[in-house]
Amino acid sequence: MPKLAVAFIGTNKYLDFLPSWHESCEKYLAPGCEKRYLVFTDGELEGIPDNITPYYQEHLPWPYITLYRFATLLRASEEIQKYDYFLFLDADMILVDEVKPEDIF
């Protein structure tokens, strides 16, 4: 089974998007793949699913959170290398239909 790491950056109010984001990814993203979610946030994560790995990320004002996106993601490079695929999806993105690995990789 292919393995997919999916990154979410949600600090401050953007952490509120995590539950619906995660739910839509679980339902529609890469069926048949083992998924691990790398969640970068400054907030508290309580009762999170087992397939979420949290990373602390200080809240940065616009535009710095976007400008430093790749530096943020690189902090998880060792874990990302364990996966067959890696994908970053915006925190306010919701999947509404199935997305197969062959559609994006």
Where are these regions (language model features)?
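Generic preference for flexible, low-structure residues
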Residues: 22, 41, 70, 102-105
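N-terminal anchoring/stem segment of glycosyltransferases
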Residues: 1-65, 78-82
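GT-A fold catalytic core of metal-dependent nucleotide-sugar glycosyltransferases
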Residues: 73-105
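Glycine-rich, basic loop-to-helix element that forms the pyrophosphate-binding segment
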Residues: 65-72
